[in-house]
Regions:
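Conserved short loop/turn motifs at secondary-structure junctions
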Residues: 74-78, 109, 210-214
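Conserved RNase H-like, two-metal-ion catalytic cores of nucleic-acid enzymes
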Residues: 1-89, 93
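Accessory DNA-binding and partner-docking regions appended to nucleic-acid-acting proteins
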Residues: 115, 131-327
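A short, charged helix-loop
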Residues: 89-116
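Short, surface-exposed recognition loops or helix-turn segments adjacent to catalytic cores
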Residues: 70-73, 102-111, 141-151
């Protein structure tokens, strides 16, 4: 749960062994400690759906990542054109039933959990355990279990990388910012991030993206000018020393992120590759972005001598020859 905090709060852990019943572990109840060692340190895969945040919590609360994971959203993307299928859609596809959604927005940090919440949480993992063999069978039929293992290994690798600081260009409305706006936006974004992390607050409770963008577009050149747009008791003033230092520094505006520029010839090759990827994805019955994103293709066309994920793993079998032929 991340509704009221900067760091996600673990509200409940649900597990279900194949053929067994669900077990609910309450991390907010000291008498019912989560068996992290059993969950994280065994050879059987931990099955998740859209599990990036689950993995973040495992690392944060359990101190480690599982040895092996199997993300069912990734697995279904490898055997269908649906890049990000929802849990409910997955259950409906394999089991032909509509899972209960009544407790999705429930307050999972409130205690005690009611019977409806506990039943909902148990069904959540029991249905996942039931559909998992069907997904495995479909991937085995398509000879794509190795693809799934590769994509899940990449998911674990991404979780071990340092988290990138929140940057101005991730703000809602960032594309409309001009150079002078971007300097102020970056300063305010950094100050907001520092305060949110220090006090474990959601960014939006300190300052919404919309408010931040509006102030940045005024381009206050100094801290004194910024004070015209922030109330005296605004929480961002808790970062006064940092704000003072950053406004006093004569730093140029951050550059606008841009995609590589392609020559006329490279542009033609890029367009051919996009068409090839789209056609190949249709043949494989997967989403084109799973095979190769536009960004990855463009970077490859701009610098074909550089290493690329398109030249490794299961993608290489479908892309390497075409990439080398065109470029």
């Amino acid at each position: 749960v991340r509704e009221h905090s900067y760091i996600p709060n673990l509200a409940l852990v649900q597990t279900c062994q194949p053929g067994g019943n669900a077990h609910l572990y309450d991390p907010l109840d000291g008498a019912d400690a989560v068996p992290w060692h059993n969950i994280l340190h065994h050879s059987a895969p931990v099955v998740l759906h859209a599990g990036a945040q689950d993995l973040e919590l495992m690392q944060l609360c359990g101190g480690a990542l599982p040895q092996t994971v199997r993300d069912t959203q990734i697995g279904f993307a490898l055997c269908s054109p649906h890049l990000a299928v929802s849990y409910a859609q997955l259950v409906e596809h394999f089991l032909g039933i509509s899972p209960d959604k009544s407790q999705t927005r429930s307050d999972w940090l409130a205690r005690p959990l009611n019977a409806e919440q506990r039943s909902y949480a148990a069904a959540d993992v029991e249905l996942l355990a039931r559909l998992y063999p069907y997904l495995v069978a479909e991937l085995r039929r398509l000879n794509r279990l190795d693809w799934w293992a590769e994509e899940n290994a990449a998911l674990l690798t991404r979780q071990t990388r340092p988290r990138e600081p929140w940057q101005w260009y991730r703000l809602q409305g960032a594309p409309q910012l001009r150079a002078g706006d971007r300097r102020v936006a970056q300063i305010l974004t950094e100050a907001r991030e520092r305060l949110a992390a220090a006090q474990d607050l959601p960014r939006r409770t300190i300052m919404s993206d919309r408010q931040l963008i509006a102030i940045a577009q005024k381009q206050p050149p100094t801290l004194e000018a910024l004070a015209e747009y922030l109330s005296e008791n605004h929480p961002l003033w808790q970062e006064l020393p940092y704000l003072s230092e950053r406004f006093a520094a004569d730093t140029p505006p951050p550059a606008q992120p841009s995609s590589p520029r392609l020559s006329h010839t490279r542009r033609q090759q890029y367009e051919k590759l996009c068409r090839y990827v789209a056609d190949t994805a249709v043949d494989l019955n997967i989403h084109p972005d799973l095979l190769a994103t536009v960004r990855t293709l463009k970077h490859y066309c701009a610098n074909p001598s550089a290493d690329s994920p398109l030249l490794h793993g299961w993608r290489a079998a479908y892309l390497r020859e075409e990439l080398q032929k065109l470029l």
